[in-house]
């Protein structure tokens, strides 16, 4: 399926020198079929493709465009920063300012280090947990994505609860390396306790998405995050909350503020730079002081704390800290999801939505709750593919995978919400 011959030709040209025609796999539309849409520009809640077609966007560059695309204050901040120089490889006051803001908003973060991406942040947090504890094993959860570092491209293997070993999910990850990562079912407190009872004194840390955004959107059950906090305290393991997707997105203080849990380390993504390439990790002072140059855990980056991202982030936080910013954002999303649910019910299509702040999930299922990767796999993926293409045809851009969360921004108007609901009504009618 292709929107136009021009899109087909552009994808063919891209595939000549770019593997698969894309620079990140999900963009290839393998999860939904068809040809990727090539985007020319974006503004507010909208994208325009190379054919000039406009879309109401619910991807938001995978989360960080919380103010909408090309917000004038962000553009001005970036332009001003660029005029002063793109990169110095030296400290700037803007790094300090943004670090101060992050630590003030998230009390669990006493020290913070900037990186170039969320993957770098989670990769280094794992290294730091190992360096701090002197242990090797890491616990992660099915359906959670923490970037593409070797330690985390791992699934539960047959030797998980006998030998405490994981198996790679990607070629190129050595089995001897992956065996140090244990993968457990999300929201399974019993499995967590069993794992720690067997291997707790070998476990350096636990990393988790507090709201999983890569098996669509799955929220933690009551007590799950606190159970992780408790076993980490008992076995002196490092509790890492990966807020690359949820940080400043589900609430100003991140998911950790919503669920009232305090991690030892937190990882953050490109939202702290208003969508520019940046990440960060931070947490307890005694752990963070193990990072070079204070300690023996190495981390570095020429563009870490780059001035464009720092100044864009500082400007963005001025908006996020305004009274009622998040309550208005959440209310707008509630309106959208209620309309989508009503449209599906009217069409007689099994459909469910979930919301966490300004993140949302859409599921074609009659299950009561979606609480794990297995329950997500039980959803009707083929129905999602039809829905995706029906909405795209009508000018609504959703993530091209049934396993990705959606996002709303402060730029989405009442008219955009109504437009989206009407597109859904027409698409559901077409799917009957």
Swiss-Prot record:
InterPro entries assigned to the protein according to its UniProt record, in alphabetical order: 4pyrrol_synth_GluAld_NH2Trfase (IPR004639), Aminotrans_3 (IPR005814), Aminotrans_3_PPA_site (IPR049704), PyrdxlP-dep_Trfase (IPR015424), PyrdxlP-dep_Trfase_major (IPR015421), PyrdxlP-dep_Trfase_small (IPR015422)
Pathway noted in the entry: Porphyrin-containing compound metabolism; protoporphyrin-IX biosynthesis; 5-aminolevulinate from L-glutamyl-tRNA(Glu): step 2/2
Keyword Isomerase listed: yes
Pfam families (UniProt xref): Aminotran_3
EC number annotated for this UniProt entry: 5.4.3.8
UniProt GO molecular function: glutamate-1-semialdehyde 2,1-aminomutase activity; pyridoxal phosphate binding; transaminase activity
Compartment(s): Cytoplasm
Keywords of the record: Cytoplasm, Isomerase, Porphyrin biosynthesis, Pyridoxal phosphate
Modified residues (N6-(pyridoxal phosphate)lysine): 270
Annotated GO CC locations: cytoplasm
Cofactor: pyridoxal 5'-phosphate
PROSITE patterns xrefs: AA_TRANSFER_CLASS_3
Top-level taxonomic group: Bacteria
Gene Ontology biological process terms from the UniProt entry: protoporphyrinogen IX biosynthetic process
Swiss-Prot/TrEMBL catalytic activity: (S)-4-amino-5-oxopentanoate = 5-aminolevulinate
Self-association state and partner proteins as the record states: Homodimer.
PANTHER family (alphabetical): GLUTAMATE-1-SEMIALDEHYDE 2,1-AMINOMUTASE, GLUTAMATE-1-SEMIALDEHYDE 2,1-AMINOMUTASE 1, CHLOROPLASTIC-RELATED
Family note: Belongs to the class-III pyridoxal-phosphate-dependent aminotransferase family. HemL subfamily.
Protein name according to UniProt: Glutamate-1-semialdehyde 2,1-aminomutase
Record organism: Acinetobacter baumannii (strain ATCC 17978 / DSM 105126 / CIP 53.77 / LMG 1025 / NCDC KC755 / 5377)
